[in-house]
């Protein structure tokens, strides 16, 4: 049995779509039962249950990293859904669980030579927080800050979900 929690931050809905596609892939690949939950960071638990086998954390890349209050405010002025907090703040509040596999992902605009990644920053912050098995996962591309998701990325996210499910079911996380 595999239980997965996917925590995401999504301002324009792009990262939510990616998180849902990853979850669909994991559900499609799981023959042993279990549960794959997708929750917005505003509703995410600050204690990860012992029944969770894999934690995925994803968010948009804003200002070369995870969002901050100012970048979220800027996005809201462009029509984004306002969030109480972002992945950065959630990581600062969540109780670490030693030994839990954690994989991060992000969405971002493909701009040549643009440094920084929310997935990299989140993995580093999670390790610093005490999640010793946190690793950077995938980046998924959006056409513009507001989206949409680049064609083919939802399918790639679903396929990545299938691959992650295989890793977990074989004990290689």
Where do the model's predicted regions map?
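Residues at the starts of beta-strands that form the adenosine-phosphate
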Residues: 2-3, 35, 101
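N-terminal beta1-alpha1 ligand-phosphate binding loop
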Residues: 2-30
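Short histidine/acidic/glycine/proline-rich micro-motifs that form metal-
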Residues: 12-13, 108-113, 142-144
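Short phosphate-binding/catalytic loops that engage adenosine nucleotides
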Residues: 31-34, 131-132
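A structural preference for short, hydrophobic beta-strand core positions in alpha/beta folds
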Residues: 35-40, 135-138
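Helix-loop-strand module that forms the ligand-binding subsite of alpha/beta enzymes
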Residues: 39-129
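Glycine-rich phosphate/pyrophosphate-binding loop and the adjoining helix
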Residues: 132-173
């Amino acid at each position: 049995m595999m239980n997965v929690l996917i925590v995401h931050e999504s301002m324009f809905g792009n990262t939510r779509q990616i998180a849902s596609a990853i979850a669909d892939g994991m559900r499609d690949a799981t023959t042993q039962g279990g549960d794959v939950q997708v929750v917005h960071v505003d509703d995410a638990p600050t204690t990860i249950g012992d029944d969770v086998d894999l934690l995925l954390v994803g968010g948009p890349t804003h200002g070369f990293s995870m969002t901050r209050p100012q970048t979220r405010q800027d996005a809201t002025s462009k029509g984004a859904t306002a969030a109480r907090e972002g992945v950065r703040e959630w990581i600062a509040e969540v109780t670490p669980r030693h030994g839990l596999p954690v994989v991060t992902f992000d969405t971002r605009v493909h701009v040549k030579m643009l440094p920084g990644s929310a997935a990299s920053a989140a993995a580093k912050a999670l390790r610093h927080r005490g999640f010793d098995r946190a690793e950077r996962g995938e980046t998924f591309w959006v056409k513009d800050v507001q989206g949409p998701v680049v064609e083919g990325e939802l399918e790639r996210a679903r396929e990545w979900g299938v691959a992650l499910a295989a890793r977990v079911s074989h004990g290689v996380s």
